[in-house]
């Protein structure tokens, strides 16, 4: 998809530019039990970094759940650097920020990917970064992929802005972190975006940001630099790289004999979907992150990272146990679909009561009245294998909304294919597409 909306505007308005790197957020301490939440958050923000329909959908969802999502784009002759910042204040006053970069989206990004030569990496200011990379007598310095370095320099370390005191955005970010040593910055991305997040963290480290403030989580990251780069920066930042089993891109640069090596904590995921999907796509990483989260976090309500302020109904919503009619290949997805649907409704509406049992319509309406609910939502999820597309499915969501005395308010059916999104996320997409109709039926 063409990114004209980003290319045509070099920056957001001045006020947004000022806010972009005014982080002022407290560190989010992460226990071992919270790692699935952080991985899912990183996957969400990485997905939102893309400008396709899926990315725009995730951005809308993040904003609905009280995330502030801002974007900026800076074009140079070498690259079109794009960066996004997601921020949220938690209930206890802590705030979290995630800096993300998109993967390959346009022709200029492809040129960046194919710029395979290695350039020297060093310096303690943007001017020095540029000078060192342009130098030739630097055998003792670390070296990095030229295209990835071009992308990061364009995004954060090229243009000095009056709004940042004639500093680059990257310098403003580094200074903000150094002034507030209690702060933590998460950096994330997929593919090209993964490489950019690591190079950015290394640049911030060279600007004096200490390791405890830099946490990098990547998906399908190619190698970025040589052995010297790996050994130097493995102690200057926290780096977790999540790799899908059989993802060909994660190892492609090592196979080219350019001296690029991987480092950091490696976590290998094996895709559990039975759909026929390319193992490098961000949608598959997001799908696995969601599954790991559902497996690890067994609660009645979503984690506070994924909650916002629900819309208050004039009378509660009684949600019938979902009806699922899925082909055998998607049967294993049923618990995840049910959990995702539950959380999506719980986040959007209040009060809600969820039924766990089936029954007749009469018993359903009676249960809703007994629970003090004015509305009843009935959802049916179904899918069929597409013969013309191996491993792909046609999914349908049917929604009925009634009053608790049995009066039908809304009946709607929506369908999509599992082309761009796996089944779980595709059903969530259908739910989101029906939000306006559902809201209207519920009197919102």
Each language-model region and where it sits:
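Bacterial N-terminal signal peptides
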Residues: 15-27
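Surface-exposed short loop/turn segments
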Residues: 360-415
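Serine-dependent carboxylesterase/thioesterase catalytic core
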Residues: 171-253
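C-terminal/domain-edge helix-coil "capping" segments
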Residues: 310-315, 386-390, 400-444
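A structural "domain/chain start" motif
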Residues: 305-349, 439-444
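A conserved cap/lid and substrate-binding interface adjacent to the catalytic center
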Residues: 70-188, 206-213, 236
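Lipolytic serine-hydrolase domain surface
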Residues: 226-311
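N-terminal secretory signal peptides that target proteins for export/translocation
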Residues: 1-9
């Amino acid at each position: 998809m063409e990114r004209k909306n980003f290319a045509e505007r070099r920056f957001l308005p001045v006020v947004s530019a000022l806010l972009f790197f005014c982080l002022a957020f407290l560190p989010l301490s992460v226990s071992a039990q919270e790692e699935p939440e952080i991985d899912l958050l990183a996957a969400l923000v990485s997905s939102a970094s893309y400008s396709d329909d899926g990315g725009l959908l995730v951005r809308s969802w993040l904003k609905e759940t009280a995330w502030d999502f801002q974007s900026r784009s800076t074009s140079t002759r070498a690259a079109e650097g794009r960066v996004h910042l997601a921020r949220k204040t938690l209930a206890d006053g802590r705030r979290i920020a995630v800096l993300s970069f998109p993967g390959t989206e346009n022709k200029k990004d492809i040129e960046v990917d194919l710029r395979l030569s290695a350039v020297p990496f060093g310096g303690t200011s943007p001017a020095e970064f540029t000078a060192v990379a342009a130098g030739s007598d630097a055998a003792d310095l670390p070296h990095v992929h030229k295209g990835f370095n071009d992308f990061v320099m364009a995004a954060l370390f090229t243009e000095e802005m009056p709004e940042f005191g004639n500093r680059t955005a990257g310098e403003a970010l580094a200074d903000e972190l150094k002034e507030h040593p209690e702060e933590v910055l998460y950096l994330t991305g997929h593919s090209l975006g993964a490489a950019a997040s690591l190079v950015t963290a290394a640049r911030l480290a060279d600007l004096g940001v200490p390791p405890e403030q830099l946490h990098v989580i990547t998906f399908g990251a190619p190698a970025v630099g040589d052995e010297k780069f790996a050994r130097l920066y493995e102690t200057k930042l926290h780096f977790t790289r999540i790799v899908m089993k059989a993802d060909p891109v994660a190892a492609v640069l090592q196979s080219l004999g350019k001296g690029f090596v991987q480092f950091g904590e490696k976590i290998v995921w094996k895709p559990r979907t039975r759909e026929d999907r390319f193992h490098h796509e961000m949608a598959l990483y997001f799908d696995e992150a969601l599954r790991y989260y559902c497996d690890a976090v067994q609660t009645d309500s979503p984690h506070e990272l994924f909650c916002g302020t629900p819309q208050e109904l004039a009378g509660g919503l009684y949600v019938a146990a979902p009806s699922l009619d899925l082909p055998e290949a998607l049967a294993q997805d049923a618990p995840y679909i049910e959990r995702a649907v539950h959380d999506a409704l719980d986040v959007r509406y209040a009060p809600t009561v969820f039924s766990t049992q089936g029954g007749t319509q009469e018993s359903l309406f009676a249960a809703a009245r007994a629970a003090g609910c004015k509305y009843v939502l009935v959802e049916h999820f179904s899918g069929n294998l597409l013969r013309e597309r191996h491993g792909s499915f046609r999914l349908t969501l049917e929604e009925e909304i009634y009053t608790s005395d049995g009066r039908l308010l809304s009946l709607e059916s929506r369908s999509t294919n599992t082309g761009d999104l796996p089944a779980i996320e595709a059903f969530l997409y259908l739910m989101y597409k029906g939000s306006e109709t559902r809201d209207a039926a519920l009197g919102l």
